[in-house]
Amino acid sequence: MEILEEKPKEGKIKIKAETLDDLWHLYHIISEGDVVYAKTLRKQAQRSDSLRPEKVEAVPVFLGIKAEKINLHRFANQLRITGPIIYASREDVPLGRYHTLTVEPGTVITIQKEKWKNYHIERLKEAIESSKKARVMIVAIEDGEAEIAIVREYGLDFVGSITYNISGKRYNIKRDDEEKKFFHEVAKSMEELMKRENIEKAIVAGPGFYKENFVNFLRENYPELAKKVVTDDTSMGGRTGIYEVIKRGTVDKVYTESRISKEIKLVEKVIEEIAKNGLVAYGLKEVEEATNYGAVETLIVLDSLLKGELREKIEELMELARNLRASVVVVSSEHEGGDKLKALGGIAALLRFKIK
């Protein structure tokens, strides 16, 4: 993500989205009531002459819409913002009509808020910093099956699954040929994804020697790809193997601690403290009380709470926690750490001292 222009007095920040992760960050930055400006296409009736009926054409226009619905469509690589038009660069575009702005990687938008809160500014900074980090791919491979995932800011993005029917006994010529075809297919998928997604490292994981055979194959046939690969031992292949890689902290060894790993560890720490009746509070009532006492060391909030009915209350609590020198972490609902936090009410806090 790139910030192109800031107008603090008007509450405007002009941004260029560059990746799917950026769209995810924008989904959490843009709130209902914000005004979003962007170039777009809008269907307009065009009268060619008095004898012919009107024809509808998509004309380019710069619009400002007041956001009412914000939806992230990950598989389409799009963020869609719907609301009434409050500004149009063309006089023939009626104000008040509804329009949907589609934001994709490469789109430039301007966001206008009545007040930019610390949470939103921190999120912007985080998006900019994360765009500088290398992306990581995980490939879990086991006897004719490969699962491919990209480690994104919000969690794991499972982007491919390859299954090949490899028959016969080991060291059989037919089996070896089938295995090579499978390895070629996995390698080509990896190359294509790494180029498209600008991925610099891949972790190849799996049980036994199968992954080593695959990496040796890469060294012989795809030497440039092999240079970007590290291996990890897991008990299983498939998605289970990929989750195992995350839990083992292998991604963190490839580059600085990933967001998903940090969030999962933090939620696990909360659960550990609950189990021993330690320095922890969970659920809105308990966390609010702990914050008011100044007892919160780290406030942990599920991102979906910031899109629901409690948004304003949660944002106020986050601001209060920051003012009392607590750190605030927003956890993605897209991974298992988010699922566990949701079961605790979507909000928890690690404490400096007990309040009860």
UniProtKB/Swiss-Prot annotation:
GO molecular function, one term: metal ion binding
Keywords: Cytoplasm, Endonuclease, Hydrolase, Metal-binding, Nuclease
GO biological process, one term: nuclear-transcribed mRNA catabolic process, no-go decay
UniProt keyword annotation of Translocase present: no
EC assignment: 3.1.-.-
InterPro entries: eFR1_2_sf (IPR042226), eRF1_1_Pelota (IPR005140), eRF1_2 (IPR005141), eRF1_3 (IPR005142), Pelota/DOM34_N (IPR038069), Pelota_arc (IPR023521), Ribosomal_eL30-like_sf (IPR029064), Transl-rel_pelota (IPR004405)
SS bonds (residue pairs): none
Listed GO CC annotations: cytoplasm
Signal sequence bounds: none
Cofactor(s) demanded: a divalent metal cation
Enzyme class: hydrolase
Record keyword Hydrolase present: yes
Chief place where the protein resides: cytoplasm
Compartment(s) of residence: Cytoplasm
Pfam families noted in UniProt: eRF1_1, eRF1_2, eRF1_3
Purpose of the protein: May function in recognizing stalled ribosomes, interact with stem-loop structures in stalled mRNA molecules, and effect endonucleolytic cleavage of the mRNA. May play a role in the release non-functional ribosomes and degradation of damaged mRNAs. Has endoribonuclease activity.
Family (UniProt): Belongs to the eukaryotic release factor 1 family. Pelota subfamily.
Domain comment, as recorded: The N-terminal domain has the RNA-binding Sm fold. It harbors the endoribonuclease activity.
Subunit structure: Monomer.
Annotated protein name in UniProt: Protein pelota homolog
Organism this protein belongs to: Pyrococcus furiosus (strain ATCC 43587 / DSM 3638 / JCM 8422 / Vc1)
Lineage, uppermost ranks: Archaea, Methanobacteriati, Methanobacteriota, Thermococci, Thermococcales
Gene: pelA
